[in-house]
């Protein structure tokens, strides 16, 4: 029997790779991809057969609910990512209400699988411990005030877990995603090309290749326990070392200056001044960012059989020099 998949966020950075991975994984399947507007994709997905592009809004279930009839698996990747305080209401509507609407429609349509692309932001970092799936935010109100995006993701996770006995629910929590099309590496590369000196925070961060995340989605269709969350990450590395790796890949030279505590306070003061002037750049306080964030992928390796296929250097190289 031919399987049918319903995918949201298919035009995004990760979403395009998910659509491609599902298309290659199940050559006979029908893919229904919900988008807000039609546009060309860097992976040229519009040229693929067996894909139905549907226009709709997750905040308006009447625009997509009928398309869930006959769907076996829902892959929910769409989300509004922002750290601007002024976007808090929009984030809640898009990420919490939108996910709730999709979940209710999927239950009503009798869908069997619901794969939710959450985020490592839905965890709580507790250095020097390595972050794992058990580390939920201990103060949800503080999370809501300081990180509405992460709050929206963990709130949706909780609602999904409540129905995990009625429908199979798998939650994936990717770390910082790299690979062809990555804006994170692109920003670093642009700074390297322009600046001879690079101020850099000193914390440990966690990275994974976009193609490895897409493969985790494919595995989650049949592997894993309903209601469980799985961190998807490949490499833990200090940001100074990460930047040195980007320099090496680009064959560039620049002086990296680790930011001191005083430097972090100075930058946060400038950010706060911009917010007061209503010029919010959408950057979180550096003091909130500048904490070690090593993450464990032991659970997804053990239960889904997932292993990263791309090293950090391979991910950076394909981000800086994507294939044409």
Per-region residue spans from a language model:
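N-terminal Rossmann NAD(P)H-binding glycine-rich loop of SDR-like oxidoreductase domains
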Residues: 3-25
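Glycine-rich Rossmann NAD(P)(H)-binding loop
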Residues: 8, 179, 199-203, 230-237, ...
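NAD(P)H-binding glycine-rich loop region in Rossmannoid oxidoreductase-like domains
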Residues: 51-97, 105-108
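Conserved Rossmann-fold NAD(P)-dependent oxidoreductase catalytic core, especially the SDR/UDP-sugar
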Residues: 97-148, 170
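Flexible, glycine-rich beta-alpha linker
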Residues: 123-124, 167-188
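Active-site Tyr-X1-5-Lys
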Residues: 144-170
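Substrate-positioning beta->alpha
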Residues: 185-187, 199-222, 228
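Mid/C-terminal beta-alpha module of Rossmann-like enzyme folds, strongest
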Residues: 216-281, 297, 313, 317-320
